[in-house]
Amino acid sequence: MSHRLVYSIPLREDEEIQMSLKEFKGNMYCDMRVYFNAKDQDLKLPSKKGLTLKIDLLDPLLEGLTKVKQALTSSDVLLETEA
């Protein structure tokens, strides 16, 4: 399995979201996963928190994220917190 880190988003000092491309059994995937610092090591380890998608789902994902962003900035959307 090949793996190529493409982008990372810092969350906290000891955590980040890593976005990478992976090849597995001849198929390409986009993996978005939270990584954390291993204790007493200079190493980041993957957590169970993440998402792995086939490459053909990237465009629908981007479309959905765009709609979420538009909804957040739209005046007709009211976000409620659970009581």
Feature map (PLM): residue ranges:
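Intrinsic disorder/low-complexity signal
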Residues: 12-15, 30, 41, 75, ...
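A short, structured beta-strand/loop element
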Residues: 17-49
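Mixed-charge, Lys/Arg-enriched low-complexity segments
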Residues: 55-83
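Negatively charged, low-complexity tracts enriched in Asp/Glu with abundant Ser/Thr
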Residues: 1-12
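Beta-strand-rich receptor-binding modules of extracellular spikes/adhesins
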Residues: 44-60
